[in-house]
Amino acid sequence: TTPQTIFPVAWTWPTGKKITCPKTNLFLKPYKTYDNHKRIAAAQSHFRLWQMCASMNEPIMILEHDALFTKKFTAQETSAILVGAYSINDPRGATFKSKDYHNNLVDGFNKVPWVAPENIPQGLPGHSAYVITPWAAKDIIEKQDRIGWWPNDAIMCRQLCEWLYVYKPYFTK
């Protein structure tokens, strides 16, 4: 998806001032972006991949253009815990409070750590490299339809997606 090929959506993320979402009670802060169409295009790219994951009924890996592998990826066993999606990306330099994010993780699967007040959406570091299951893809599509469209890294947050994890050691940066 590019800014030229975006389709109309119910974009509810603020572009001017900070708000509290009436549907989630989460504090939403506008992103610093020159062209909001690029933010919408990125959200639509992830959305299309979530749709593909759900229709294929197979887990998929989603990689953004800037994801760089630092070692060979091996799919992690998720049957022992209820993992809907997990990041494989090193948070350092990829998200806000990235050092705190990294320092709160141990080897293996980790819930997305709290690095800010709990009313601020907190999700995968950079949202640029993750594995998602079909049931989680269906869940996030439903949430987006109900809440409205947000940037993909905000809608897929710990507060809305209890099935969100981070895997360490990381495979990408």
Outline where the language-model segments fall.
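An acidic/histidine-cluster motif and surrounding catalytic segment
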Residues: T1-L63, A67-K173
